Swiss-Prot record:
Catalytic reaction equation(s): UDP-N-acetyl-alpha-D-muramate + L-alanine + ATP = UDP-N-acetyl-alpha-D-muramoyl-L-alanine + ADP + phosphate + H(+)
Pathway named in the protein's UniProt entry: Cell wall biogenesis; peptidoglycan biosynthesis
HAMAP family linked: MurC (MF_00046)
Protein name: UDP-N-acetylmuramate--L-alanine ligase
Source domain of life: Bacteria
Keywords, alphabetical: ATP-binding, Cell cycle, Cell division, Cell shape, Cell wall biogenesis/degradation, Cytoplasm, Ligase, Nucleotide-binding, Peptidoglycan synthesis
Organism of provenance: Limosilactobacillus fermentum (strain NBRC 3956 / LMG 18251) (Lactobacillus fermentum)
């Protein structure tokens, strides 16, 4: 890619910060602006030598390409100034597509499991081939002359329709983001449109009915555990140390693979990685070694030992994700009591899946529900945290003032789940736990 100067409006956003770092790695000049509030993306940007400025139209200079963050409207002062100056303005997805076009690219899509699968694929490929990658947990790495580009393709507001990758992985199709999609059929239509933009091949989870019905123009390779899947995991053994399985392509055994990750979804995610590597003729012995070395991505089953407790931080905010996270915790800690602190994320999502949230959370031994985290677009709604508690036997409400309730538990697992600001509850608990000892 020709070296350019990029100015990010909203550079502290998770995806924006990752993309900024990737473009900087590729030799471009990168800077941007955002609000004053401290974020976890700030230090990595500083480490990369990327200036983060306060909003000011005077920041803009001739020749800059302005990347407009999704949260910033056309009437934002810097966007207005950029238009007056005649600068090129493009979205995050449009900017990612420019990187996609210069590599053998693999876009990972799915209602759930995108970040975990992207992180796993990026880790594996980058240790066996030159690979650039962009992960939804805020990590972006650019490698000059890379063979591969691995990136997360988000379906929200149809952002992934900007992309035309060589390959796509589709982990599942589910009705999420009820503030944008009308129903499951609407979501499936978007995935199918994205699939038609893929150039070489598509890897899709075989048990997903919507993915089985895809009408696309490239070969679809199904992965899973069923006999009719193209790539199949068999003889799966799950223990507190992780999972081991035999991988097959059709009737051909590709090898025995081990991952130190938990839950059935982790087996499926790793099988998708094996499938991509096989189709690109990468040495599977190297893939085997790198799969065994992977420990996970940020905010996806991130563990910490404090006193006699296991504290887990997880991004789960949809019933399917909650079920998968609880399954993973049961696998790794089969003898321990499992306590979940859940922060509902947006009123519309809670209202759309209230019953399903109740069913998934009821798999834990004890559940505490925090106040609802509303989005910028949605600060209230017709549903309450109490409505969810009523569906979960023995559940209780909790907030920062009552976080000490959790100190009653010993030698147990506490999982903090949510996509909002659940960390504030987790940080309070950890501080109290360290005091308790």
């Amino acid at each position: 890619m020709e070296k350019k100067t990029y100015y990010f409006v909203g550079i502290k956003g998770t995806g924006m910060a990752a993309l900024a770092r990737l473009l900087k790695d590729l030799g471009n000049e990168v800077l941007g602006s955002d609000i004053e509030k401290e974020t976890f993306t700030q230090q990595p940007l500083a480490d990369a030598g990327i200036p983060v400025l306060s909003f000011d139209p005077a920041n803009l200079k001739e020749g800059m390409i302005v990347v407009q963050g999704n949260a910033f409207s056309d009437d934002h002062e810097e966007i207005v100034r950029a238009k007056e100056m005649g600068l090129k303005i493009q979205s995050y997805p449009e900017t990612v597509e420019q990187v996609v076009a210069n590599h053998t690219s693999i876009g990972v899509a799915g209602a759930h499991g995108k970040t975990s699968t992207t992180g796993l694929l990026a880790h594996v490929l980058s240790n066996v081939e030159q690979t650039s990658y962009l992960i939804g947990d805020g990590v972006g790495v650019g490698v000059a002359d890379a063979r591969f580009f691995v990136f997360e393709a988000d379906e929200y507001r149809d952002h992934f329709l900007a992309y035309h990758p060589d390959y796509a992985i589709m982990t599942n199709v589910d009705f999420d983001h009820p503030d944008y999609f009308k129903d499951l059929a609407d979501v499936k239509d978007s995935f199918e449109t994205y699939g038609r933009q893929v150039k070489k091949g598509l890897f899709a989870w075989g048990e997903d009915k919507s993915l089985r019905d895809l009408n696309v123009d490239v070969p679809v390779y199904y992965y899973g555990t069923a006999p009719d899947d193209d790539f199949r995991a068999a003889n799966i053994v799950r223990t507190p140390d992780g999972s081991t399985y035999d991988a097959y392509y059709k009737d051909q055994k590709l090898g025995t693979f081990t991952i130190h990750l938990y839950g059935e979804h982790s087996v499926l995610n790793s099988l998708a990685v094996v499938a991509v590597a096989y189709m690109e003729k990468i040495d599977l012995e190297k893939i085997k070694a790198e799969l065994a070395n992977f420990s996970g991505v940020k905010r996806r089953f991130a563990e910490e030992d404090i006193a006699d407790m296991k504290v887990i931080d997880d991004y789960a905010h949809h019933p399917s994700e909650i079920k998968a996270t609880i399954d993973a915790a049961r696998q790794k800690f089969p003898q321990k009591e499992l306590v979940v602190v859940f922060q509902p994320h947006t009123y519309s999502r809670l209202a759309a899946y209230l019953t399903e949230f109740g069913q998934s959370l009821s798999r834990a031994d004890k559940v505490f529900v925090t106040p609802i985290f509303g989005s910028i677009r949605e600060q209230n709604g017709s549903v309450s945290a109490k409505d969810l508690e009523d569906l979960i036997p023995g559940s209780e409400d909790i907030d920062q003032a009552s976080i000490t309730k959790l100190l009653a538990y010993h030698d147990a697992v506490v999982v903090f789940m949510g996509a909002g600001d659940i960390e504030k509850y987790e940080d309070d608990y950890k501080a109290r736990l360290k005091e308790r000892g």
